[in-house]
């Protein structure tokens, strides 16, 4: 699924401040956003790091294109970390959500295995 958002920004607005205001995306933090982020910070024992952040570019012509980082790899000090998540809502069944994350991580693992064998 892809959503395209377009808009015009007042002159003099710093594009970095715009990005900081919209990320992490509400679809990954919950709503209301700031209360959800506070709860996540209090409940989760590990930082989400760049998970749920953005990757993209801001062009010299002030164009901007970004994607939300929901399935990610990080290679640091000879250690590869990969992450995925699920959308938990009031009617979620924890076991089903865990299975969904397992499937997503399985796809990342397969990508690693494919890269290693090629």
What are these regions (language model features)?
Residues 1-118:
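Conserved hydrophobic core element of enzyme catalytic domains
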């Amino acid at each position: 699924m892809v959503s395209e958002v377009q808009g015009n920004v007042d002159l003099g607005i710093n594009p970095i401040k715009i990005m900081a205001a919209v990320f992490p995306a509400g679809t990954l933090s919950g709503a209301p956003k700031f209360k959800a982020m506070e709860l996540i910070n209090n409940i989760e024992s590990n930082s989400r790091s760049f998970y749920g952040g953005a990757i993209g570019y801001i062009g010299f012509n002030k164009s901007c294109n970004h994607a939300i980082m929901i399935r990610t790899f990080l290679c640091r000090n000879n250690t590869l970390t990969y992450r995925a998540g699920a959308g938990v809502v009031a009617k979620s069944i924890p076991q089903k959500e865990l299975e969904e994350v397992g499937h997503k991580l399985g796809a990342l693992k397969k990508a690693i295995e494919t890269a290693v064998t090629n």
